[in-house]
Amino acid sequence: EKFEEFLNAGGVVEPNDAMPESYRNAVFRFIELHANSEYMGGLTERDWIPKAPGLHRKLTALAKTQDEIGHAHLLYMIAADLQIKTREEMMVDLLEGRTHFHNVFHYRVHSWTDQIAVAYLVDAAALASQQAVFRNCSYGPYKRILRRVIAEEGFHMRNGEEMMLLMAHGTRTQHEMMQESIN
């Protein structure tokens, strides 16, 4: 009850603070899911590095891949600080299918315009979700990392928007391809 009062008063919990196991487990599960999703998002983006049209888009896909994998590693690090699983155990669980990641990463992307649509829509949704979590986050390390992740996800969303608008205002064929991907 005192812990809930502390949280309700805007208290911030650090890794070495006393906390109920239910809180520790809930925070861990949430961060592990977020880390897994960032990792899988990076792998999805990675697949488009050689397929992206032109050097600029290839470099952009490479930079985004690095960002997503970097987010995952930061998140795995703070999840491990909760002393429920090590980083290695989390990776093994992910690769062996024992833990989860956001559903969108279960689907294959078949065309460049599909990739653009996914990049924009998923990054926009992730940004909105992460901003809401940031506002209400009581776990200090996660809140600090979210600040960085949110800044970079904003860049990713704007990049997706730029690519989507470029296709939408391109040739009739490009416009139709982009519209089909959005649909």
Predicted features and spans:
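Acidic/His metal-coordination segments adjacent to aromatic residues that form catalytic metal sites
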Residues: 12-32, 93-119, 136, 167-174
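Helix-loop segments that flank and shape redox-cofactor active sites
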Residues: 19-23, 41-63, 126-142
